[in-house]
Design a protein with these regions (language model features):
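Residues that define the transmembrane beta-barrel architecture of outer-membrane proteins
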Residues: 31-37, 73-79, 114-118, 151-159, ...
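Start-of-domain marker
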Residues: 23-84
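Transmembrane beta-strands of outer-membrane beta-barrel proteins
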Residues: 51-53, 91-95, 120, 131-137, ...
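Bacterial Sec-dependent N-terminal signal peptides
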Residues: 1-28, 251
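Outer-membrane beta-barrel transmembrane domain signature
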Residues: 138-231
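Sequence/structural signature of outer-membrane beta-barrel proteins
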Residues: 23-25, 56-67, 98-108, 140-148, ...
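Residues on the lipid-exposed face of transmembrane beta-strands in outer-membrane beta-barrel proteins
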Residues: 37-43, 81-85, 120-126, 139, ...
Length: 267
């Protein structure tokens, strides 16, 4: 895991030099192991309007600065329903709501709060001979009470670019169906009030994963994630890293599932 941490730290330093302005106070950095587990259920709604739905359930656990166990504490539990419009070629539009129950973790400075999000998202996919590219823009507004009990309403803009490589299947009866190797980078900018946070930079995230089908209706993702988040004090970076797994059930069979919209992360 140390190699992953070093590589991610080097890449993040390059990104930071481009997206953060200089400050008098020095930056500090802490490393926190984490894990993300998710189960999704996708189902049709109104076919003639190209509408479908999806329900996501997510569990995020973490360690702390001096605790290397990514499963030590429960960070948050999430329920996230979506309505999806797929009437455009190569594009999907998503409208969603997220119910985030976050828990206190004294060692990491986390406090207990209930966070709700309203989300609008668009994903554009470009098919390639042996894979696909995708660009995703997500606008969400977060509603929660901060550690002082003050209510906060914070818009956040997220931009993701990803690549999927379709892997060959040489066996007549393979164990997994339509396997892929995927990876993406994602940048998140927050627009909070000055009394909460001065900086717009919020999170930079990287993820690499393997996806495949168990059956035409059940697909899974297994990978790793690394992300760097700026705390609201403007000088402390938390670097989260660890495993990510996801299982998706589609009521309608799918030949291939690449999990382009998976929301794997610890913030």
């Amino acid at each position: 895991m140390s190699l992953l941490k070093k590589s991610f730290l080097l890449f993040c330093c390059i990104i930071l030099s481009q997206v953060l302005k200089a400050q008098d106070a020095p930056y500090t950095m802490g490393f926190i192991p984490a894990s993300i587990s998710e189960v999704d259920v996708a189902f049709p709604l109104i076919e003639k309007w190209n509408l479908s739905g999806q329900a996501d359930m997510q569990l995020v656990t973490q360690g702390a600065y001096t605790n290397g166990n990514p499963f030590e504490y429960t960070q948050r539990k999430v329920i996230r329903p979506w309505i999806i419009y797929s009437g455009f070629k190569n594009m999907k539009l998503w409208l969603g709501y997220a119910h985030n129950q976050k828990y206190a973790i004294e060692e990491a400075g986390n406090y207990k709060t209930l966070e709700n999000r309203l989300i609008v998202m668009g994903t554009y996919t470009q098919e390639m001979p042996k894979g696909s590219l995708f660009e995703q823009v997500r606008f969400e507004t977060k509603f929660f009470d901060d550690r002082n009990g003050n209510h906060q309403t914070i818009p956040r803009l997220r931009a993701r670019f990803g690549v999927n490589h379709y892997l060959r299947q040489s066996k007549e009866k393979p164990i997994f169906l339509a396997p892929n190797i995927g990876y993406y980078t994602e940048l998140m900018l927050k627009f909070a009030s000055k009394d909460y946070a001065d900086e717009h930079f919020d999170i930079f995230r990287l993820s690499v994963y393997y996806t495949a089908g168990i059956t035409p209706n059940i697909h899974f993702l297994a990978g790793v994630i690394g992300q760097m988040q700026l705390r609201t004090n403007g000088t402390q970076f938390d670097v989260y890293y660890g495993p990510m797994v996801s299982l998706k059930y589609s009521v309608r069979p799918k030949e291939r599932e690449t999990f382009d919209s998976v929301d794997g992360g610890a913030d």
